[in-house]
Every structure is written in structure tokens, then in C-alpha cells.
Swiss-Prot record:
Belongs to the bacterial ribosomal protein bL34 family. Keywords: Ribonucleoprotein, Ribosomal protein. Residues 24-44 are annotated as: Disordered. GO terms for cellular component: ribonucleoprotein complex; ribosome. The lineage of its organism: Bacteria, Pseudomonadati, Pseudomonadota, Gammaproteobacteria, Moraxellales. One of its GO terms (biological process) is translation. Pfam families: Ribosomal_L34. GO terms for molecular function: structural constituent of ribosome. This is Large ribosomal subunit protein bL34. The keyword DNA damage does not apply. Residues 31-44 have a biased composition (Basic residues). The keyword Protein transport does not apply. InterPro entries: Ribosomal_bL34 (IPR000271), Ribosomal_bL34_CS (IPR020939).
Length: 44
């Protein structure tokens, strides 16, 4: 059985990156929440 986590920098960026977050209203809400909480890193 292969491992479930097969890292790919490109897929990671496309799904969880800053531009992906900014592309949707919900994604912008995620960023706003993380800014309000004072997260050091907003996205991956």
C-alpha cells in the first residue's frame, strides 16, 4: 500500500496558495480570519 501523502509543490500552491485564496470570496474570508487571529503565515 502506498503512502497517502505524495507531496507536490505545484498542487499545494494551486489549492492552498495565496492567489487561490484570493480568487474566491470564501478564500478571502479565510485570509481575513487568519489576519484577525494574527497568524504569522497566512497561506502555505
Amino acid at each position: 500500500m502506498k503512502r497517502t501523502f505524495q507531496p507536490s509543490e505545484l498542487k499545494r500552491k494551486r489549492v492552498h496558495g495565496f492567489r487561490a485564496r484570493m480568487a474566491t470570496k470564501a478564500g478571502r474570508q479565510v485570509l481575513a480570519r487568519r489576519r484577525a487571529k494574527g497568524r504569522h503565515s497566512l497561506t502555505v
